[in-house]
Amino acid sequence: MAKKTIRDIDWSGKRALVRVDFNVPLENGQITDDTRIRAALPTIRYLLEHGAAVILMSHLGRPKNKVVESMRLAPVVARLAELLPEAKAIKGTQATTGPAAEAAAQDLKPGEVLVLENTRFDPREEANDESMARELAKLGDVYVNDAFGSAHRAHASTEGVARFLPAVAGFLMEAELAALQGALENPTRPFVTIIGGAKISDKIGVIENLLGKVDALLIGGGMANTFLLAQGYEMGDSLVEPDSVPVAKDLLEKAASRGVRFMLPTDVVIADAFSADANRRVVSVGDIPPGWRVLDIGPETVRAYTEIITTAQTVIWNGPMGVFELAPFAEGTRAIAQAMANCPGMTIVGGGDSVAAVEQMGLADKIRHISTGGGASLELLEGRILPGVAALNDA
């Protein structure tokens, strides 16, 4: 469903109340990765250039409904000032709502930016309390949601406030929806998805929804072990979910009945311990000995998956192929990242480890769309409606 965007508003003299995702990693008060701040810059710049005063709000970390000094947004304000020299002023406040926030918002002039304090310091945020939503709405004239990464949460700053102001999408939100919904609703075929990660139980809804849409589904990571177990293979000491075996069998049957290629590893990298310096070897999935565990996909599987990916026209990848955090077992994930970069079609990567692999290998510019939202992109892949998106005005 198409939503209004910041292009649909005359911003001259208006205050834009913008929900961004500035949930950045901090170490000793220093930002270690400012990707999420940079991702919001196109929206902020557009608003400033079109005569708006810009009020930004975000959560940071999990302060559990109280003020936590180490989770204040002051480091974000400082970084934003470095990244946005064209702003007439960039101000911070230790208030999110109430008289101090209202006074700061009233004083804000076109071309200036105000960063409100961490929304999750207020217990009403995660409860989606109407009183907080109304107080936030007092601060601006139009609400902009550019926080796709929080769009699956119905909080006061992501969903509640949209009931009390005109509500539109920012550029990041627009790009995420266009890429993911476009791929799911109108893909150029062949349409392939690669799903990895540790557990089937986390991705049942995603796989079920995709089985009605894709031409091929490639499975890796720990979840592949449970599918292999469902097919009768001995999995040694591998991570498996015995309770999910019936679900795995059901998904395999559904794929077969719908003519979807459901690809599982044919060879794997096994180790005798969960450790980077463990003994390891490559075996066929039928030859996993007792006491050994699967920690990555093998080279034969990499070749088969690579061929499917590089000949596809639409590919979505979410989740690692192995224990990506241990270097000897990161090869499968890295190989899939390379295959994605070599695919000429529409390529979309989401999920922390998948994105990290692409970025570590310097391949980010070869991927058409890198999703900023882990949980939000998974819920879209499940076919769910995201509260933060549903709350925006229809185009």
From Swiss-Prot:
Places the protein is found: Cytoplasm
Q: Which reaction does it catalyse?
A: (2R)-3-phosphoglycerate + ATP = (2R)-3-phospho-glyceroyl phosphate + ADP
Q: Where, in this chain's numbering, is ATP bound?
A: K203, E325, G351, G352, D353, S354
The record's CDD domains line, in alphabetical order, gives: Phosphoglycerate_kinase (cd00318)
Q: Which domain of life does the UniProt lineage start with?
A: Bacteria
The record's top EC class is transferase
Q: Which InterPro entries match?
A: Phosphoglycerate_kinase (IPR001576), Phosphoglycerate_kinase_N (IPR015824), Phosphoglycerate_kinase_sf (IPR036043)
Instruction: Identify the residues that bind substrate.
Output: D21, F22, N23, R36, H59, L60, G61, R62, R120, R153
Query: Where is it predominantly found?
Result: cytoplasm
A single MF term (Gene Ontology):
ADP binding
Family membership: Belongs to the phosphoglycerate kinase family.
**SUBUNIT field:** Monomer.
Q: List the protein's name.
A: Phosphoglycerate kinase
